[in-house]
């Protein structure tokens, strides 16, 4: 029964020291309990916490993951420019995956940076936290259902991000519709 399988596979509030610990655990869980969708295996309702998010290096030689590229992609997001040309300027080239996902004008709708900056959401979150560190309303909405036809090839994986200050430390809760553990988890 698929529903029972999904319920059994629910991982909630697991605590990991770093990204590598989380990656290894989730990788094993997907292989063991993942529900198949074509060439994809998935776990549902996965919730976890990483105590040291700065320790984000994942040790998997087969993954061929580039820290240099990840940093360039992050800088592209922060720029707020959704055109793949900007990524090319930062990284030195535009990876093929982004060329395939871009619209005819070179725009990528799943570039989170332009979504964060839409309606000055990121600025608003910063101001909210400065004025009321106890707020639970400091959220950024990324996915907009009204834009579903615009997303075509590049529906954002992240729906929303909530920022809270807990014990004097900034915490971030990310809600996603999907996450590619192999390439997108870092």
Per-range role (PLM):
Residues 4-186:
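Terminal, non-catalytic protein-protein interaction segments that mediate quaternary/complex assembly
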């Amino acid at each position: 029964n698929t529903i029972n399988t999904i319920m059994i596979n629910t991982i909630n509030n697991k605590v990991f020291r770093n990204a590598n610990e989380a990656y290894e655990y989730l990788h094993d869980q997907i292989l063991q309990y993942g529900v198949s969708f074509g060439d994809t295996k998935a776990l549902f309702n996965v919730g976890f916490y990483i105590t040291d998010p700065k320790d984000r290096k994942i040790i998997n030689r087969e993954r061929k993951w580039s820290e240099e590229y990840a940093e360039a992609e992050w800088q592209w997001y922060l720029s707020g420019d959704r055109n793949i040309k900007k990524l090319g300027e930062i990284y030195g080239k535009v990876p093929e995956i982004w060329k395939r996902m871009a619209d005819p004008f070179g725009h990528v709708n799943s570039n989170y940076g332009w979504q964060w900056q839409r309606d000055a959401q990121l600025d608003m979150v910063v101001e909210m936290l400065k004025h009321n560190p106890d707020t639970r309303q400091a959220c950024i909405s990324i996915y907009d259902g009204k834009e579903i036809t615009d997303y075509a090839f590049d529906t954002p994986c992240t729906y929303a991000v909530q920022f809270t200050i807990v014990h004097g430390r900034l915490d971030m809760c990310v809600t996603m519709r999907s996450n590619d553990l192999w390439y997108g988890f870092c």
